[in-house]
């Protein structure tokens, strides 16, 4: 038997906590026997004193075990259970293509996703732009979709890592969100509760990333890989660029539209293709679905070319209560904004810099994201045809096309887009799309 205040005191004095102490405290968070003040105190001591790798693994596993941990053995799946998690960005629509692509190659992807947070878009918000799409199927239906379709994208239920929800809410109001061990545990508790064989992390770097610097993004990626592997799940991470909008669009319906066009081969943004392929390759290798990168890329290209990935996406949409003919008739189902009009730079030149975070906030300001959890979303608004870094813009080539609900909203977004994108006489060197891979 432990006392919460003694655990806090021990960590306050710079000592490492035992697995039993950490589990006692996390179970207390779940059972409401630990107060909000005690949660805040422990969070602050961890913020200042950090955690050893064994502590980080214990914290993550205790938070995972605070609720249901999914088990797929009874389904007798004939392939690995794998997933991807992104730290979030703008125009990051990879999940919608990656899930069906990996499923078409023999993987099973029980993806538990989130809503938009701050400037970053949320996969669930994008999918809810599809009429009828159900992000909370019951457990039996979820398992049925995984077995028969291969991929489902759902929201986090109260039974998964419930301690994380309360812990995070306290961190949010006590300036302890940006602690590497706490971020790591929060991300992984939910992902490891999916009962995975392998996980791939997409950790963003740049002006639209969650972490403010390359060094911190790298530190987070290394922490996640170390903890997840320590918890028994094969995990690798890719550091990918978020110094510009990843897709050609940013919003909800506009990104779903781009995802369908990507899967059907109608249009594939080169940077989006590179990131999606790189993440899928990692998933196939980690899951034992390919022997090397060359084989993995060939398999992935094949399921794109032969329409299998697009077909699986369509089956997932139908299985989650969306329209059965969505892939063929997506334009009929996706909402369109009242006003769609291009915004041009004030001068001709090359795009040299982009404040990706500001572009994400411009979409939020139009109604495409939430400022607070209770806000409703306008799924139709957003940006499309985004200019890329290094691209020439002029009176013919706009910075973007803005899809807005009114002229006033368009004007506000146009000013934000122009302020967020720097245009100069000479083209700057563009960043790599994938900076590095971390496997241990």
UniProtKB/Swiss-Prot annotation:
Belongs to the thymidine/pyrimidine-nucleoside phosphorylase family. The keyword Transferase applies. GO terms for biological process: pyrimidine nucleobase metabolic process; thymidine metabolic process. This is Thymidine phosphorylase. It is an enzyme of class 2 (transferase). The enzymes which catalyze the reversible phosphorolysis of pyrimidine nucleosides are involved in the degradation of these compounds and in their utilization as carbon and energy sources, or in the rescue of pyrimidine bases for nucleotide synthesis. InterPro entries: Glycosyl_Trfase_fam3 (IPR000312), Glycosyl_Trfase_fam3_N_dom (IPR017459), Glycosyl_Trfase_fam3_N_dom_sf (IPR036320), Nuc_phospho_transferase (IPR035902), PYNP-like_C_sf (IPR036566), PYNP_C (IPR013102), Pyrmidine_PPas_bac/euk (IPR018090), Pyrmidine_PPase_CS (IPR017872). Its EC number is 2.4.2.4. It comes from Cronobacter sakazakii (strain ATCC BAA-894) (Enterobacter sakazakii). Keywords: Glycosyltransferase, Transferase. NCBIfam families: PRK05820.1 (NF004490), T_phosphoryl (TIGR02643), Y_phosphoryl (TIGR02644).
């Amino acid at each position: 038997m432990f006392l919460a205040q003694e655990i806090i005191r021990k960590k306050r004095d710079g000592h490492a906590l035992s697995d039993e102490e950490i589990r006692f405290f996390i179970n207390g968070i779940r059972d409401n026997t630990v107060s909000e003040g005690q949660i805040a105190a422990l969070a602050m001591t961890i913020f200042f004193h950090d955690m050893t790798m064994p502590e980080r693994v214990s914290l993550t596993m205790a938070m995972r075990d605070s609720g249901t941990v999914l088990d797929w053995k009874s389904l007798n799946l004939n392939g690995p259970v794998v997933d991807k998690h992104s730290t979030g960005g703008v125009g990051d629509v990879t999940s919608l293509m990656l899930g069906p692509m990996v499923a078409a190659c023999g993987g099973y992807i029980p993806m538990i996703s989130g809503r938009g947070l701050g400037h970053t878009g949320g996969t669930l918000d994008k999918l809810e732009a599809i009429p009828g799409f159900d992000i909370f199927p019951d457990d039996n239906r979820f398992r049925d979709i995984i077995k028969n379709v291969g991929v489902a994208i759902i929201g986090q239920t109260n039974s998964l890592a419930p301690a994380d929800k309360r812990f995070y809410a306290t961190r949010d109001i006590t300036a302890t969100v940006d602690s590497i061990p706490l971020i790591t545990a929060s991300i992984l508790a939910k992902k490891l509760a999916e009962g995975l064989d392998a996980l791939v992390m997409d950790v963003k770097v740049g002006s639209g990333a969650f972490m403010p610097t390359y060094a911190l993004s790298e530190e987070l990626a290394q922490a996640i890989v170390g903890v997840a592997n320590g918890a028994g799940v094969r995990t690798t991470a890719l550091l990918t660029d978020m110094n510009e909008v990843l897709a050609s669009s940013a919003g909800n319906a506009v990104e779903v539209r781009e995802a369908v066009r990507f899967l059907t081969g109608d249009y594939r943004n080169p940077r989006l293709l590179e990131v999606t392929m790189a993440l899928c390759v990692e998933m196939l290798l980690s899951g034992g679905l390919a022997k090397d990168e060359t084989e993995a890329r060939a398999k992935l290209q094949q399921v794109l070319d032969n329409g299998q990935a697009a077909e699986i996406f369509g089956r997932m949409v139908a299985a989650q209560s969306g329209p059965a003919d969505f892939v063929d008739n997506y334009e009929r189902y996706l909402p369109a904004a009242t006003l769609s009009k291009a915004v041009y730079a004030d001068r001709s030149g090359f795009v040299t810099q982009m404040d990706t975070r500001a572009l994400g906030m411009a979409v939020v300001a139009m109604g495409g994201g939430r400022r607070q959890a209770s806000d409703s979303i306008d799924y139709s608004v957003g940006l499309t045809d985004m200019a890329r870094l290094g691209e020439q813009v002029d009176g013919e080539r706009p910075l973007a096309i803005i899809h807005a609900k009114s002229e006033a909203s368009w004007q506000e977004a146009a000013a934000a887009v122009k302020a967020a994108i720097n245009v100069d006489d000479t083209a700057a060197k563009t960043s790599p799309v994938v900076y590095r891979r971390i496997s241990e």
